[in-house]
Regions:
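Membrane-interfacial helix-loop-helix connectors in multipass membrane proteins
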Residues: 292-307
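Faces of alpha-helical transmembrane segments in polytopic inner-membrane proteins
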Residues: 226-237, 321, 325
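Short cytosolic juxtamembrane segments of multi-pass membrane proteins
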Residues: 331-344
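Transmembrane alpha-helical interface segments in multi-pass membrane proteins
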Residues: 240, 248-294, 313-317, 321, ...
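Hydrophobic, regular-secondary-structure patches
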Residues: 1-79, 97-100, 163, 190-191, ...
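Peri-transmembrane interface segments
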Residues: 2, 6, 182-233, 242-244, ...
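Mechanotransmission and gating elements of multispan inner-membrane complexes involved in transport
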Residues: 13, 50, 69-75, 101, ...
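Short beta-strand boundary microenvironments
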Residues: 76-120
Length: 344
């Protein structure tokens, strides 16, 4: 569920219709990218981009990571985005839930930003102050962008963020395709080599970002495997002790005519039934306690979702572990020789 949530939020953030213009060499880190302000104007001249009420869907943005000081004086690392209202043209999944878009001296926070900041939700209520450096801002809006990392961001007026970060450039320019193709936007990077630009689809950028977290996902599977191995060995110890006291009982049953395969199946059924009980209890606890739980990570937050597929994998793994843990003790219990059964 952790791996699925992390992968889903990164894949959902990127759109195939959005093309990002970055500084050459910064294709894997938008925060390190520097793009000249003129690139935004040039991008608007590309034909075939999406139009809204006569405005071309092009947004120059500043992305930055920095600590923010909240109303309760606590400080936490946050993901900041400096934007203009044109950002809504290229990110149509962003919807203002309450308040309005920020003006200078104001910010708009994502629906899940309090999880990223490890703060109670009321701290980011409308009208609350928020400090970046020595400058105080007022929260004037809340927004959502379902299933994306943007929901954990804090959006500033672009000029404010440029001033505070002392930069005269953008991090990127995002262009939304209409009839145009990716190659039409990429052609700008070849025409203006002096600007040292690189073009990448937004989905491609976040796919690269997802590959960066592949070792973390591998560690998640490794941790699960270690926990499973511990459960198997713990079960082996328990069942060896439980079945050892039943060797005489098994011998008696064999002596009166029950064969070993039938007794082996009986012992395994007992073990699997006990395992299934524990698995179902753990599944119920997971559904009620973890489903919808939000976890912060470096680029945002993701939400755990206990889907039917996750439930099937969990229950199936529990039954498999019960089977593996029962076989060796059951075979050992039935191994001692016994006299031939009596016949009438």
């Amino acid at each position: 569920s952790v791996n699925r949530g992390m992968t889903q939020v990164l894949s959902a953030t990127g759109s195939e219709r959005n093309v990002i213009l970055l500084g050459a060499g910064s294709e894997e880190s938008i925060e390190r990218s520097e793009v000249h302000l003129e690139a935004e104007t040039l991008a608007r001249t590309i034909g075939g981009l999406e139009q809204h009420l006569g405005q071309t869907a092009v947004s120059g943005e500043i992305h930055y990571m920095a600590p923010l000081t909240l109303a309760d004086a606590s400080s936490a690392q946050a993901r900041l985005r400096g934007v203009t209202e044109r950002a809504l043209l290229v990110h149509p999944n962003v919807r203002v839930l309450a308040g309005r878009f920020p003006n200078p001296g104001e910010v708009m926070v994502g629906r899940l930003a309090h999880h990223k900041l490890d703060a109670p939700e009321p701290i980011l209520a409308l009208g609350k102050p928020l400090r970046f450096g020595n400058v105080e801002f007022t929260i004037v809006g809340h927004f959502e962008a379902p299933g994306t990392v943007m929901e954990s961001e804090v959006w500033f007026d672009r000029n404010d963020l440029a001033t505070l970060t002392q930069r005269d450039s953008l991090s990127c320019v995002v262009a939304r395709l209409g009839e145009a193709e990716f190659e039409d936007v990429a052609a700008l990077t070849f025409r203006r080599t002096d600007m040292e630009l690189a073009a990448i689809t937004e989905s491609g950028y976040y796919a690269r970002l997802a590959s960066f977290y592949r070792p973390i996902r591998a560690m998640t599977w490794l941790t699960a495997a270690l926990v499973a191995a511990g459960a198997v060995f713990g079960g082996l110890n328990t069942l060896y002790a439980a079945f050892a006291s039943r060797i005489r009982e098994m011998g008696t049953l064999q002596a009166i005519g029950f064969d070993r395969p039938a007794l082996l199946a009986s012992l395994i059924q007992e073990s699997v039934l006990a395992t299934l009980t524990g698995t179902l209890l753990a599944t119920i606890a997971g559904v009620f306690l973890l489903d919808g739980f939000t976890i912060p990570f470096s680029v945002g937050t993701f939400t755990l979702s206990i889907t039917p597929k996750v439930l099937i994998v969990g229950i199936g793994s529990g039954l498999l572990l019960g089977l593996l843990g029962a076989l060796p003790p059951a075979i050992r219990c039935l191994r001692p020789p016994h006299p031939p059964p009596h016949t009438a």
